[in-house]
Regions:
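Short functional hotspots at interaction and active-site rims
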Residues: 1-202
Length: 202
């Protein structure tokens, strides 16, 4: 049986206390107010890991060893829909992320929304909080080592599955595939992911 892993830091008393406090707080919040953000990545070497073949045969799929810059995906999700997705070549920086929040996320927020994200350094500039609060929303960071509290994680898995199925081998095709892939996400997916992450559906 394949082993699963989890961060050893979850065993720390301080981390457990933060997670418990977050869970107590979130039970009082209407899940329709929650907006989760996160990043993921894709590259030109992505493809399916399994294939149907006649018994005794082996499929050898050419994949580039030098695939250049990773394609960063940054998106946001609500309990009833995928909110927005953008792509950019290279690593996510604080400036890039703040620009995305200002131009892509903020116009889609509503007064009273609660924006949640992890503690990545690029997420910490004060400008991000100012942008979010300017539209009447609030910003809150997830507890450390708590990706399981972010319902966008399985969305990335679904998007990457689509990318692996297409197996794009040029930059423009990879980017176009990633930008189209989120259209497979339906409201029922979002609701199931929120429920799986422990959020009560109103």
């Amino acid at each position: 049986q394949k082993k699963r892993s989890r961060p050893a830091e979850l065993d720390r008393a301080s981390v457990q206390a933060e997670r418990c406090a977050f869970q107590r707080w979130i039970r009082r919040i209407d899940s329709r107010r929650l907006v989760f953000l996160d990043e993921s990545g894709a590259n030109l070497a992505m493809g399916r890991s399994h294939a149907w073949l006649p018994r005794g045969t082996v499929l050898v799929e050419p994949r580039p060893r030098n695939w250049g810059d990773n394609l960063t995906l940054v998106g946001a999700i609500r309990v009833d829909r995928w909110l927005t997705l953008s792509t950019a070549w290279g690593a996510m920086t604080a400036v890039r992320f703040a620009d995305w929040v200002e131009h892509r996320l903020a116009p889609r927020l509503r007064a009273g929304d609660i924006v949640l994200l992890d503690n990545l350094t690029a997420h910490k500039p004060r400008r991000i909080r100012r942008i979010i609060e300017a539209v009447g929303a609030t910003l809150r960071y997830l507890p450390p080592y708590s990706h399981d509290f972010n319902p966008i994680e399985p969305a990335w898995a679904l998007i990457k599955k689509r990318i692996r199925t297409i197996a794009p081998r040029t930059g423009p095709v990879l980017r176009a595939t990633a930008q189209r892939a989120y259209h497979v996400i339906r409201p029922r997916h979002c609701q199931n992911w929120f429920a799986h992450a422990g959020y009560q559906l109103k």
